[in-house]
């Protein structure tokens, strides 16, 4: 007999203990680093460096604390059968309203688990936003906006989650052994639909998007024309992130006819035109090399693997009984919830692989910007320092957690590409 319960708990603890070990390595590195690293000693003052170290340490301590609490609450939820309790309560409610079928019962179960997750997360996100971020001058969010965001995001989660869940349960019960294939088709359809509706209907609920204009717009459109990006007032936007915090970012997303580049207003206000164009050159690099599509394909491989493995275990009564449920006839949603605990090591492996490709894509986008004639990394340093970004990372910690290369890795890569560019264009 396979003891799924012991395997799941062991994997869960192993993953978190390794994460704690990496946090310890990173914390020790930060503690021992008292002087500005050589690669940026002429770019940052000792005072700003010290503040950066304090911010990095505060975030790391926060991460360690929240992970510790997550481990304890998860173990307690297994020791005291919280999930079976919610499942039985869901049946009672479904019977009271006269619809004790699996879909209605699963919708109640989903609502309970989402509700508990949202409520227990609020103190941590509040602390992070209004204490940690406030301490270092980044918080600009009001408590009213904080509450509004939580309400809207929860309603969206339930509003979209319940219909998708109901459809998924129907498909799984209908499709039998081929459930992995039909569920994958459903997820592909949902992904493509979300890419279409997210920028138009979802994002405006949280932020205001203004088309880029003026001299900056003319320069960006000229650069876009050089690289073949279909730029217009409907594809490049400035978002009012400053109403939430002082952080800066730019990102490209979308496929087919929904391609967009978004610049934070904090970024536009902080960088000069040439630096902003260098940022745009990087984002255009993601577009030209189809990084969004490639990442989406990687995610599909992950999903197919997950769904196929789930199809092999969904009818195994041992999986359910070892976690306090009656049998595999309980629910598709219960089976998926339990399976995700068991699947966590494979999920982590895929996350690491996706990080490897993501880091590679960042280097490629930087290379593309160099080929456009942006021959330094000043904008990266400026952004990093304004963000009080960590200046040194333990290599194991970075490889495990980061989807982007570190500042020194990107800077060194750009310097090498600039040298080659200058040789080629003498």
Curated annotation (Swiss-Prot):
The chain crosses the membrane at residues 4-24, 71-91, 107-127, 151-171, 179-199, 295-315, 334-354. GO terms for biological process: CAAX-box protein processing. Signal peptide: none annotated. Keywords: Endoplasmic reticulum, Hydrolase, Membrane, Metal-binding, Metalloprotease, Protease, Transmembrane, Transmembrane helix, Zinc. Residues 25-70, 128-150, 200-294, 355-426 are cytoplasmic. InterPro entries: CAXX_Prtase_1, Peptidase_M48, Peptidase_M48_N. It is a multi-pass membrane protein. CDD domains: M48A_Zmpste24p_like. GO terms for cellular component: endoplasmic reticulum membrane. It catalyses: Hydrolyzes the peptide bond -P2-(S-farnesyl or geranylgeranyl)C-P1'-P2'-P3'-COOH where P1' and P2' are amino acids with aliphatic side chains and P3' is any C-terminal residue. The keyword Oxidoreductase does not apply. It is found in: Endoplasmic reticulum membrane. Binds 1 zinc ion per subunit. Belongs to the peptidase M48B family. This is CAAX prenyl protease 1 homolog.
């Amino acid at each position: 007999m396979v003891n799924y319960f012991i395997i799941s708990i062991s994997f869960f603890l192993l993953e978190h203990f390794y994460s704690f070990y990496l946090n310890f390595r990173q914390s020790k590195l930060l503690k021992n680093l008292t002087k500005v690293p050589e690669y940026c000693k002429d770019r940052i003052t000792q005072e700003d460096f010290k503040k950066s170290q304090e911010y990095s340490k505060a975030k790391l301590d926060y991460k360690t604390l929240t992970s510790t609490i997550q481990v304890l609450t998860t173990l307690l939820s297994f020791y005291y059968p919280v999930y079976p309790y919610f499942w039985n309560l869901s049946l009672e409610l479904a019977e009271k309203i006269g619809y004790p079928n699996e879909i209605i019962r699963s919708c109640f179960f989903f609502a309970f688990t989402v509700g508990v997750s949202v409520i227990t997360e609020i103190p941590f996100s509040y602390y992070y936003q209004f204490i940690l971020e406030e301490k270092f001058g980044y918080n600009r969010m009001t408590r009213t906006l904080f509450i509004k965001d939580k309400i809207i995001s929860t309603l969206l989660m339930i509003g979209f989650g319940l219909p998708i869940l109901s459809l998924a349960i129907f498909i799984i019960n209908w499709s039998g052994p081929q459930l992995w294939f039909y569920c994958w088709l459903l997820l592909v359809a949902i992904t493509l639909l979300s890419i279409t509706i997210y920028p138009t209907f979802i994002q405006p609920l949280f932020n205001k998007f203004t088309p880029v204009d003026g001299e900056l717009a003319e320069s960006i459109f000229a650069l876009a024309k050089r690289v073949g990006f279909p730029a217009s007032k409907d594809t490049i936007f400035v978002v009012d992130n400053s109403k939430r915090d002082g952080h800066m970012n730019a990102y490209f997303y979308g496929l087919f006819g929904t391609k967009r580049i978004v610049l934070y207003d904090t970024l536009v206000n902080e960088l000069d035109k040439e630096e902003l164009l260098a940022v745009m050159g990087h984002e255009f690099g993601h577009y030209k090399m189809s990084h969004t599509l490639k990442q989406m394909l990687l995610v599909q491989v992950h999903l197919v693997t997950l769904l196929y493995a789930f199809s092999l275990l969904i009818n195994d009564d041992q999986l359910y009984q070892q976690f306090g449920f009656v049998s595999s006839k309980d629910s598709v949603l219960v089976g998926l919830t339990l399976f995700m605990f068991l699947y966590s090591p494979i999920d982590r492996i895929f996350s690491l692989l996706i990080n490897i490709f993501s880091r590679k894509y960042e280097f490629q986008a930087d290379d593309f910007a160099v080929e456009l004639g942006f021959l330094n990394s000043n904008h990266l340093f400026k952004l990093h320092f304004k963000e009080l970004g960590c200046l040194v990372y333990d290599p194991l910690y970075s490889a495990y957690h980061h989807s982007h290369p570190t500042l020194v890795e990107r800077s060194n890569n750009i310097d090498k590409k600039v040298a080659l560019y200058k040789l080629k264009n003498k």
